Swiss-Prot record:
Gene name of the record: MPAO
Source organism superkingdom: Eukaryota
The protein, known as: Methylphloroacetophenone oxidase
GO MF, one example: heme binding
Species: Cladonia uncialis (Cup lichen)
EC number per UniProt: 1.-.-.-
Regions annotated as coiled coil: none
Length: 445
């Protein structure tokens, strides 16, 4: 398994161009000045010249990217031609989506957000980038677990899809998870009522129980025993659900300014705040180890039912062409837990928040649901237009898991009237796409 620290360091290595982007001006210049001031031998002179040569080459490359590639025609803020610091600073602050969305509103559906990165929100362009058989590819980051989300080879990705196809089919999910999910709903509602009854102001932490519920739903799909071993049943906290977000924030700091990241880790024993930012992996070390254990167990459970297992090489086979190792399955399970639990919980929080803000809609929704008779199933709720409208609109505006989805152009490609050079990152974001006024009437409503 890949630890949080090794993943961060590998990501830093892969983003060395970005590190040069924000450290060359400061660190290289300071070293050069110090050497020039302290000229005691020819060695210092050569060292100063070498540093300034690196600085010169770095800026020459920056100018080339800014003015000598087809990306110079793509609209965007002036500084995006030279540096990705504006984007990385908003990554650190957790404002990337708002930042990019603001640029879309100002510059249009295709905008340059970094020297070698563009963001798009045009539906036709998005379809081209993510279409079946597209030439655009994911880029595997060093240190990133080789899982179904990060894999870049289309053939290998299809193998994984076929391996999990039956487990994620509607028929299998309804048969294996619907009764358990209904019980999870009862547990979450009862917990919210209990918390409200125990508090003097009769309030409850809806966010907490929605996040735990979402994680338990993902747990049920993967493990099949969430009502006895899930987060709600074992009285865990939301920290386990959002641990990945904290690790992403630490990684964002490492990519934004590596010297500051190292300084923060060095000073972290002096401040709990610094420790929570720069040494998150220590705070959640127990969770990480528990996750390792669970993934090892899970690699022998739900997804491997009705498969053939070879003890010699640790491979599960659906057929001669479709097979995965226990390590592959363990990596994928990590992804399924993160990509399933947090988005389900976050979307549910936004749904409740939106409905409570609109009393008329709340009354209509409650009246529609009150007309249902037991047993309430997925099939019966699918017939409720107001409920489904609320769900779809919540997912459109506030759907969980709305991180960017970068793809890389292998060859020069025309997108939306602009030529995208090979190697350029083309980033799509469901939040920006779903709020594009060219695609939706009054998208913010």
């Amino acid at each position: 398994m890949i630890s949080p620290v090794s993943s961060i360091l590998a990501s830093i290595w892969d983003n060395s161009k970005l590190l040069l982007d924000h450290t060359s001006v400061l660190s290289i210049a300071l070293i050069g000045v110090a050497c020039a001031i302290s000229i005691r031998s020819i060695l210092y002179v050569r060292l100063a010249c070498a540093n300034y040569s690196i600085l010169l080459l770095t800026h020459a490359q920056r100018l080339r990217l800014a003015y000598s590639t087809p990306l110079r025609h793509v609209p965007g803020p002036w500084y995006a031609k030279f540096t990705a610091l504006g984007l990385r600073a908003n990554d650190v602050a957790g404002n990337r989506w708002y930042y990019v969305q603001g640029l879309h509103k100002k510059y249009g559906s295709i905008v340059r957000i970094a020297p070698e990165e563009v963001a798009i929100s045009d539906p036709k362009v998005v379809s081209k980038v993510h279409a079946l058989g597209t030439e655009f590819r994911k880029r595997q980051q060093p240190g990133t677990p080789f899982n179904i989300f990060s894999i870049s080879d289309p053939k290998a990705h299809r193998t994984r899809q076929r391996f999990y196809a039956k487990a994620f089919s509607d028929e299998t999910l309804k048969a294996s998870t619907e009764p358990a999910v209904r019980q999870l709903i009862k547990t979450a509602v009862a917990s919210i009522k209990r918390d409200a009854a125990l508090r003097k102001d009769h309030t409850a932490d809806v966010y907490k129980w929605c996040m735990l519920f979402g994680s338990d739903v993902a747990f049920q799909v993967i493990y099949g025993n969430s009502n006895t071993e899930g987060l709600m049943a074992t009285q865990k906290t939301t920290d386990e659900v959002i641990m990945g977000a904290y690790l992403q924030r630490m990684n964002a700091w490492a990519q934004f300014c590596f010297p500051v990241f190292l300084l923060g880790r060095w000073l972290s024993p002096l401040s709990p705040t610094l420790h929570n930012i720069f040494r998150v992996e220590e705070k959640y070390g127990d969770f990480w180890q528990e996750g390792q254990r669970q993934r090892e167990i899970a690699a022998r459970t739900v997804f491997v039912q009705n498969t053939k297992y070879s003890k010699n090489d640790g491979v599960f086979s659906v057929s001669d062409e479709v097979k995965l190792s226990d390590v592959d399955i363990a990596h994928d399970i990590t992804t399924f837990l993160g990509a399933g639990g947090e988005p389900v919980g976050a979307s549910l929080v936004f749904l409740i928040w939106q409905v409570l803000r609109m009393p008329d809609l709340q009354r209509e929704l409650e009246a529609e649901v009150a007309g249902l008779t037991e047993p309430i199933t997925d099939a019966t709720t699918a017939q409720l237009p107001i409920l489904n409208g609320v769900i779809y609109e919540t997912l459109r505006l506030y759907g969980g898991g709305v991180t960017q989805m970068p793809r890389y152009a292998p060859i020069a490609t025309e997108l939306g009237g602009y030529v995208i050079p090979p190697g350029t990152a083309v980033t799509t974001h469901t939040g920006a796409l779903h709020r594009n006024p060219a695609a939706w009437d009054d998208p913010e409503k």
